[in-house]
Amino acid sequence: VVDPGPPMIARLTYRFQPKANLGRDPESLADYEYIIFGGADPEMSIGPLLRRMLPLDVQVALRDAEKDLASWRKSPLRPLIEELSTSLDKDARAEIQEQVNEAQADLEGHAEVVATAERISERLIAIAGEQHAVPLTLGLSPTRIDALLRSLRLLIDNGARGIADASLGTANLIFMALKSLELDRLVTGCERDHTFFVVEEPEAHLHPHIQRLVYRYFLSTGADEEDTPPLTTILTTHSPHIASVTPIRSIVLLRHDAETNATTAASTATTPFSERDVADLQRYIDVSRGEIFFARGVILVEGDAERFLVPAFAEALGMPLDMLGITVCSVSGTNFTPYVKLLGPHGPNIPHVILTDRDPNGTGHPRVRRRLINVLQLREEDSSYNQLDADAVIARAKPFGYFVNSNTLEPELFIGGLAEAMQEVIEEELNI
């Protein structure tokens, strides 16, 4: 226990390190070992018994679900069939055996089946003679109950086709359903205090809407604490479709840190969002905005015009943004504050810049002044911003990557050398 709470917080530490008595620099994986201990104290060893009470079940990224489903050893159908086999009492087994025997007799006695078996026997006798030929019949094999149950296979389309004929996405969905049922059995078996279930890249071969449904299913498994078994689900993904429907405080971003040559984690769980921030982000983060979690850098702009023009300008300058891993994200307005909270040092800390209009306001301060003060106060606590004029605020914002034009987008484009092109578009669209 690292914090008695409430809520109480306990921590297990996994440390991968060079072997204690190595006596030299490690040269290969064989020179390393791992230790697991409680909290931050290496002396508080966590043994196998406790680890069995807190298992981590991982469903790896599905690459060939069809092959795994066809293999009795690997199939997630196996534990369900084995459970079925052990649940059958003597009377149920006898009833099934009688039904199988009747079906076997009907099949063996069918005239065409008998004729085919006789043809095979006659040819065998012709080749090897009656002394060496063995009696043959055609029938179902095996007929023992346990063997029959192991031969059960999942069928689709009302039994017309097997899993081998299903699409990759359908096979993956069936695989996940079976693994989920297997996990239910393990979790409710009273042999575990808590289970951590990791689902790796569930989006493989699935259409976007099904990706979202799969995610929402796993999200809902822990929604009702009264009826839900002790289970924590962790889902990893590269899908912006899933990211777009993820609760904004449920995101953990893993990135490579070049300076430390290590993987670092950043979470949105403690990001200082207001209720309005959460509502706005949850409402407006669609698939395109969901890309920001996978970007190396983000350019925040006001609207769709900038979202389309900025990549085109970058392409013309020989700097394709996709090649650089940079996403242009429209905030659909001028409220950049929730996005700066999301991307800033109190969140995943994704490098970002802002491109926004000055928006002159007659004799008053340009509207951009208050806009920039709001985001600058997130980056550094400084109450003196309110005493600065617009130009001073703009100058303070520039080192943070917050850039402002002289007016608004359209006049800037017009005087920036695009007047003729803009005129052509206007005339074409308005049929002038």
Segments (PLM) and residue ranges:
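Glycine-rich phosphate-binding loops of NTPases
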Residues: V1-Q97, N101, E118, R369-D391
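Flexible glycine-/small-residue-rich
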Residues: F16, V60-R63, P142, I156-N158, ...
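Acidic, divalent-metal-binding catalytic cores of TOPRIM
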Residues: L22-E27, T246-I432
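Short alpha-helical segments and helix-capping/turn motifs at coil-helix boundaries
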Residues: F37-I46, L138-G139, T236-H238, F336-K341
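Hydrophobic positions in the central parallel beta-sheet of the AAA+
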Residues: D57, T195-V199, I299
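Extended helical coiled-coil dimerization/tether regions that scaffold
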Residues: D68-S71, R78-V199, E225
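Switch/communication elements of ASCE P-loop NTPase nucleotide-binding domains
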Residues: L149, R153-S288, L413
